[in-house]
Amino acid sequence: MSSYGYDPFFPSYKRRYADSPRLHVSAMRSGGYSSARSAYSSLSAPVSSVSVRRSYATSSASGSLLHSVDSLDLSQVAAISNDLKSIRSQERAQLQDLNDRFACFIERVHELEQQNKVLEAELLVLRQKHAEPSRFRALYEQEIRELRLAAEEATSEKQALQGERESLEETLRGLQARYEEEVLSREDAEARLLEVRKGADEAGLARAELEKRVDSLLDELAFLKKVHEEELAELQAQIQYAHLSVEMDVSAKPDLSAALRDIRAQYEKLAARNMQNAEEWFRSRFTVLSESAAKNTDAVRAAKDEVSESRRLLKAKTLEIEATRGMNEALEKQLQELEEKQSADISALQDTINKLENELRTTKSEMARYLKEYQDLLNVKMALDIEIAAYRKLLEGEETRLSFTSVGSITSGYTQTAPTFGRSAYSGLQSTSYLMTTRSFPTYYSSHVQEEQIEIEETIEAAKAGEAKAAPAEEGEEEEKEEGEEEEAGGEEAEEEEEGAKEESEEGKEGEEEEGEETAAEDGEESQETAEETGEEEKEEKEAAGKEETEVKKKA
């Protein structure tokens, strides 16, 4: 913020700058531009008092100047008159320039009003377009409900089919368990069959071996019989030969016959004993082999019966397994067909849902785009309103400055023609009045500009409140609560800012000695900067509100 200061010896003002902190007020009021206009109208009284003080100071200064002219020569008077003429010509040129600028400002205001009307018409059209998608939303919601019901029915059917599938899977698992048990029993039977076959083979081998041993024993028995017969024949031949020799030598050896009889008896006993032992061994061996053969025959018969029974059971289980397998294949085929049908229905429903979601997304994007355009138009409208207010303030400032200059010129002309009485007495009063006006005016103007900025920001916040009222009905209550809190906080901040401004004005009245002045162009730039800052803040707030709206819609 800058303050203005005037030099009474120069009708044209000098520009001096004195920096002071800027004010940022976030208060929200619904006064609009009426508060700004009332503030502008309320400035007329202090400005008039300042103009009176300025005219008095100017008249005093002109009186002191004429008092000094009496003591000057004619050449100096001519130089002073030429300076005054040049100053008047400069003032006329400046006045003409200001009039031209005022006309340009008025034309610009008219153009901005026309643009504002056009933008308001476009805003109405966009609001109408924004109100239209509610019908589509109802239709889409109805279709979504129907599709959700269809999806729920499909889900229930899927659950029923899954239950049936689970029951079939339980049956299949039971059949598979039975099949595995039968396979295990078959493997056990086959193992037992192999063992029986192995035992039968071993029994056959043992029987063949025994038969071979019987044959060998029979051959040995026949050989022994033959040997025995040969021995008997030899013994008989020897006995006959001995008998003949005994008969021939009877006279010589009478005891040989008795010895031969003893020997014959001994050999007969030995042969009979050997024969009896061989027959007993053969009979015992034959009985043992017969018993083992009978036992092996019974075991082979039992094994054959068990193998035939196992084959019969295996054939029956194989037929049952084939039937179960066929039933399982049929059920799996039916289940696969049901799954394919269900997946096709689900994919069709999902495609329909995706299509509706895409349409809903496009509709939401269009709504967001319309809202963004609406926000842009509102921002442009607010910027234009701020610019118009800034131009209006500039024009009023120029009017006040022109009134100051016109009053000063009139009073200076009047004092040049009037007689001068008591100028030495009024010289101190003139200097003190000038210092009072020049020191108090910058402080007054700085407080005035601060109040204007506060009013501008209040109008911006009022526009924000209007936009918040035009927002969707779902967020109305929350936004009203937030706006109420912001209004309370903004009211407190505004009161604090006003108290700070009053304190600054009092401090400026008491101890401020620096004089400064800021041009209308810089005021316009500051107003534009504040407008841009507020526009950016509004955009951020609207983006946050849009995000909250989308989240609320998603939750709904």
Curated annotation (Swiss-Prot):
Region (Linker 1): 127-139
Region (Tail): 399-556
Gene assigned in the entry: NEFL
Domain IF rod stretches: 91-402
Record text on subunit structure and interactions: Forms homodimers (in vitro).
Family, per entry: Belongs to the intermediate filament family.
Originating species: Coturnix japonica (Japanese quail)
Taxonomic lineage from the root: Eukaryota, Metazoa, Chordata, Craniata, Vertebrata
Start and end residues of each stretch annotated as Coil 1A: 95-126
Protein's UniProt name: Neurofilament light polypeptide
Annotated segments matching region Head: 2-94
Region (Coil 2A): 255-273
Start and end residues of each stretch annotated as Tail, subdomain A: 399-445
Keywords attached to this entry: Acetylation, Cell projection, Coiled coil, Cytoplasm, Cytoskeleton, Intermediate filament
Cellular localisation: Cell projection, Axon; Cytoplasm, Cytoskeleton
Residue stretches of biased makeup (Low complexity): 464-473
Linker 2 as annotated region, ranges: 274-282
Biased composition (Basic and acidic residues): 541-556
Ranges for region Coil 1B: 140-235
Region of interest (Linker 12), ranges: 236-254
